[in-house]
């Protein structure tokens, strides 16, 4: 199976090919999909829909912390580059109360500075992370176990 299929099977979004995935009762999972088709909202609207209690200042600060400028923040998500769209999705994820993150290629489309900021944020994360990534230089020093799904091996 593919990596995205594996993650979606774990989450129960699609049925497992065999066996079953059973999640614990106290999991609060945040999921970062590799590709998502953006809607018509601006970045501000995207975050406000997710966090309606935030003030405009808090929404703008959260988006800025993810590397988006005022120009980006006021633009529709669909006109942004792939990296900028990913930053909006990451903004939602890091501001959600979770104890498990499932990340499907979160570094795709990100520039070096954004990758560094993401790695810093993930290193401070207190929960568990299941990360699909093809960039050893990104996950090196961040992860405790590496699973090679193509060879079905666990690397230490």
Region roles according to the model:
Residues 1-156:
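ABC ATP-binding cassette signature C-motif
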């Amino acid at each position: 199976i593919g990596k995205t299929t594996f993650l979606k099977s774990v989450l129960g979004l699609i049925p497992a090919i065999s066996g079953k995935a059973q999640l614990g009762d106290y999991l609060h999972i945040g999921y970062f999909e590799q590709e998502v088709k953006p809607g018509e909202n601006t970045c501000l609207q995207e975050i406000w829909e997710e966090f309606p209690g935030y003030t405009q200042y808090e929404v703008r600060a959260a988006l800025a912390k993810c590397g988006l400028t005022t120009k980006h923040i006021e633009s529709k998500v669909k006109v942004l580059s792939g990296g900028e769209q990913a930053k909006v999705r990451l903004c939602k994820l890091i501001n959600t109360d979770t104890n498990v993150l499932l990340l499907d290629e979160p570094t795709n489309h990100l520039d070096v500075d954004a990758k560094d900021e993401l790695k810093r944020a993930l290193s401070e994360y207190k929960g568990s992370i299941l990360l699909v990534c093809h960039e050893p230089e990104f996950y090196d020093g961040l992860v405790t176990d590496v699973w090679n799904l193509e060879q079905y091996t666990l690397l230490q």
